[in-house]
């Protein structure tokens, strides 16, 4: 059974060209945003009786990917494996992009801006309907990836 969140998102995406733009640009937005968030890390130590039992160096990109994986799994348990693969590829590729590409932040910001511009072009010129984020920004960011 499809959720009301899916219907909300679906009503803004009927044009084939706009859907095609979204097919390429939404993953690029998620990927570039993950690249940006990967650069924000949190170093944590969990001590027990004065000894480190867990040391993590987790970046915000991973936290967001885990959040989305949990959200989609909660909505429909059948989405776990596809979203695990999708978000795993997004996270790992963005992590290694940052690791091996000089000025990766600049590239990620440019890709993000370009992808957002393409989204609006898709809605304004092809869909001829405003983007879903105008009506509900939270629904848009929850359903988009």
Residue ranges, per PLM feature:
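Membrane-proximal soluble regions of multi-pass membrane proteins
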Residues: 3-8, 12, 124-145
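Membrane interfacial helix-start motif at the N-side
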Residues: 6-27, 68-78
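Hydrophobic alpha-helical transmembrane segments of multi-pass integral membrane proteins
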Residues: 25-36, 110-114
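Juxtamembrane "helix exit" motif at the C-terminal ends of alpha-helical transmembrane segments
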Residues: 31-49, 88-99
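Structural signature of hydrophobic alpha-helical transmembrane segments
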Residues: 47-62, 106-110
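Non-cytosolic membrane-interface motifs at loop->transmembrane helix junctions
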Residues: 52, 103-107, 131-138
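Transmembrane alpha-helical segments that form the membrane-embedded catalytic/substrate-channel core
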Residues: 65-78, 83, 96, 111-128, ...
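Cytoplasmic-side transmembrane-helix entry/capping segments in multi-pass membrane proteins
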Residues: 80-89, 136
């Amino acid at each position: 059974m499809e959720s009301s969140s899916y219907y909300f998102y679906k009503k803004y995406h009927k044009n084939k060209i706009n859907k095609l733009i979204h097919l390429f640009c939404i993953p690029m937005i998620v990927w570039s945003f993950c690249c940006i968030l990967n650069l924000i890390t949190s170093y944590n130590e969990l001590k027990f009786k004065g000894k480190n039992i867990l040391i993590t160096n987790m970046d915000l990109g991973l936290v967001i990917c885990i959040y989305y994986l949990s959200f989609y799994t909660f909505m429909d348990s059948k989405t776990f494996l596809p979203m695990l693969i999708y978000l795993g590829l997004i996270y790992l590729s963005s992590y290694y992009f940052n690791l091996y590409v000089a000025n990766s932040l600049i590239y990620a910001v440019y890709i993000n801006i370009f992808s957002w511009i393409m989204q609006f072009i898709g809605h304004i010129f092809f869909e001829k309907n405003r983007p879903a984020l105008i009506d509900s920004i939270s629904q848009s960011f929850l359903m988009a990836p």
